[in-house]
Amino acid sequence: MRTDLAGKAVLVTGGASGIGLACVRAFRAEGARVGVVDRAPGPDVVRADVTDEPALAAAVDTVARRLGGLDVVVGCAGVSGPVGTPLAGTSAAGFATVLAVNVTGQFLLVKHALPWLPDGGAVVLLGSDSAFTAAPGMVPYCASKGAVVAMTRALAVEVPGVRFNCVCPSVVDTPMARADLGAVLDDPAFPVQQAGDVARQVLFLASPASRPVNGQAVLADFGMSARSAFPA
């Protein structure tokens, strides 16, 4: 499938590692010109925390000026939060931190990138299957990803001329996931994606090949959520 992304100007947040880094590599492999915003250092990274509005706004402007504008924006910056912590042990501050990064950070990214996006531009945000399903000890994370899905739909209605979609993968083998799940990912009893799998989904949603797709949450979970509770 042709992506027609060669020469396009792409901004990726959270692009120094994990899914974000996989997206950076995938876009560059297609010939796109990519700028990276991350709070961690790295080659060609413009450093900013997505929860710091002035810093993020300046970083977006820096990348956009370097690239001569933006055609695609990909929001991959995120945190998992206190995974495995029961509700009673979850503080309001801990809950707020997850939403600040995963939700407000995406909002601020879109807000400050929009002036640089032309008609026909595309925004892809990183959601999760946790927007639709849940496991114990994941209330903050699930709430944040549910908000990303709702915000994606609202943005698609609010902003004409730019497409907004989000990818919602199940567990992905990334440094963040390994920090939460540890050795479970060495021999998992459930299907696990690689960061490159998600990057290919992002490429499709960012490309003209997905022109009619707008306001959608693309759930990629190996069909797990499709199963009935009725015993097979």
Each predicted region: which residue ranges?
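Active-site helix of classical SDR
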Residues: 110, 144, 152
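C-terminal helical subdomain
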Residues: 162, 166-169, 183-224
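Conserved NAD(P)H cofactor-binding loop of Rossmann-fold oxidoreductase domains
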Residues: 76-83, 222-223
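Residue(s) in the substrate-gating loop at a strand-loop-helix junction
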Residues: 128
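Substrate-binding pocket helix/loop in short-chain dehydrogenase/reductase
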Residues: 83-87, 91-96
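Alpha-helical segment proximal to the catalytic Tyr-Lys
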Residues: 115, 156-158, 211
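Active-site loop immediately N-terminal to the catalytic Tyr-X3-Lys motif
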Residues: 133-139
